[in-house]
From Swiss-Prot:
GO molecular function, one term: IMP cyclohydrolase activity
Pfam families cross-referenced by the UniProt entry: IMP_cyclohyd (PF07826)
GO biological process: one example: 'de novo' IMP biosynthetic process
InterPro entries given in the database record: IMP_cyclohydrolase, IMP_cyclohydrolase-like, IMP_cyclohydrolase-like_sf
Function recorded in the entry: Catalyzes the cyclization of 5-formylamidoimidazole-4-carboxamide ribonucleotide to IMP.
UniProt keyword annotation of Manganese present: no
Pathway given in the UniProt record: Purine metabolism; IMP biosynthesis via de novo pathway; IMP from 5-formamido-1-(5-phospho-D-ribosyl)imidazole-4-carboxamide: step 1/1
Gene that this polypeptide is encoded by: purO
UniProt keyword annotations, A-Z: Hydrolase, Purine biosynthesis
HAMAP family referenced in this protein's UniProt entry, alphabetically: IMP_cyclohydrol
Name used for this protein in its record: IMP cyclohydrolase
Reaction(s) catalysed by this chain's protein: IMP + H2O = 5-formamido-1-(5-phospho-D-ribosyl)imidazole-4-carboxamide
Similarity-based family: Belongs to the archaeal IMP cyclohydrolase family.
Signal peptide start and end residues: none
Amino acid sequence: MYLGRIISIGSSKDGVYASYRVSSRSFPNRKSVVNNQKVAIIPTQGSEDDIYKNPYISYNCIDIIDDICVVTNGSHTDIIAGKIREGMNMKDAVALSLLTMDYEKDDYNTPRIGGAINTKGEGYIGIVTHEGIEVKKVNPGESFYVSTYEHNTPREVDYTATNAKEATEFIFNGGIFSEFTHPVTSCAAFNKDEWEIDFKNP
């Protein structure tokens, strides 16, 4: 099954995570790049001109603000993170940013998905489509994911990871995510005592 872009946030006794996966049939030539406390999705070498074909394929997907990690499938990462830096709570930052930015105006009306979670495991995950918006609370000990296609309402998931590398691998091809096709790149932030980031570019 093809889900497109996927985000997941959650926590367990092992720690707190926020992860992201790009699955793509149209623009598979992309990679994750870490820049301080952020992860960006950019075209691979030789595919830089793809951004002129689709402006939505390059963006920050993870941003860490003190004890909070934001993860999304687009430029609204910066909007949500900016609101949180200004003092807005996670729920309002996620919901307002999704509502304001709306779904992507491409050929597929691609939904925007986004989430934020703190080091206590408290978070919110949401999606805005051409039909509406949904934002769900994530409690400590819970894990949820949502994708741009098919599974486009937050679903609970058994997510196994004890560090950033394992969280990155899991959303790429672990557990239920192994059933979803066309993985391109993945990344994750994980917090046990402090935030760490990892990424996978096959």
